[in-house]
């Protein structure tokens, strides 16, 4: 259920046939190597969206959010996700975008696309109108969640503010190692859980390969303070 652009699968661990760029395949979040034209020189200020377990970045000219331990960006009619604020980014298929991301009110999109025009600012985008009948049938309850049952917002990974410029880790493996040491949060959303599990499996496989080689050779509240 991933729309994949030259992406192998979650961190290259789950080896399955790829979908073309025009196909929606539902398996989670793609391998994080996609460049989406966002280059953040430093950790952004994030503010809670009232009533939702989501943060947004009011000072960025981008549709940039944080939810359940990951950053989410909506750009050019696609969703992208990353565990680090400046990527690399993985493509998220429309069938896999978490409900609480889909429900973010229009007013929190800092760079809304033209087709948002005329939509209520205090309501979620009309994804069914935009993405069509088939999508709406598959995600028929996306806008019916009980906000009272919403999980608490995930803690922000504020440790990442110490990694900017040349200090920013570019390799996914390095990012995961730092995250394991600095951020103990466990996600609840199935798509995010799958991504986290893929990271852990990839790390374990990498260590096993290294050992094998060794043997063979011998508007809300500001939460950034």
Question: Which residues fall in each region the model found?
Answer:
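Classical secretory targeting signals
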Residues: 1-22, 183-225
């Amino acid at each position: 259920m991933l729309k994949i652009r030259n992406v192998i699968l979650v961190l290259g661990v789950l080896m399955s046939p790829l979908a073309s760029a025009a196909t929606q395949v539902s398996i989670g979040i793609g391998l994080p190597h996609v460049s989406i034209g966002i280059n953040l020189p430093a950790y952004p200020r994030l503010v809670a969206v009232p009533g939702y377990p989501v943060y947004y970045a009011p000072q960025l000219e981008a549709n940039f959010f944080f939810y359940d331990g990951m950053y989410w960006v909506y750009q050019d009619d696609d969703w992208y996700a990353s565990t680090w604020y400046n990527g690399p980014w993985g493509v998220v298929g429309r069938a896999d975008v978490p409900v609480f991301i889909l429900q973010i009110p229009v007013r929190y999109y800092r760079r809304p696309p033209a087709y948002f025009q005329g939509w209520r600012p205090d309501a979620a985008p009309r994804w069914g109108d935009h993405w069509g009948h088939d999508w709406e049938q598959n995600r028929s309850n996306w806008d019916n969640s009980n906000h009272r049952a919403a999980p608490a917002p995930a803690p922000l990974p504020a440790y990442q503010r110490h990694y900017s410029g040349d200090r920013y880790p570019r390799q996914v493996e390095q990012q995961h190692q730092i995250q394991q040491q600095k951020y103990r949060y466990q996600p609840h959303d199935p798509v995010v859980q799958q991504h986290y599990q893929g990271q852990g499996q990839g790390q374990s496989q990498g260590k096993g390969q290294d050992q094998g080689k060794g043997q063979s050779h011998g508007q809300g509240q500001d939460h950034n303070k």
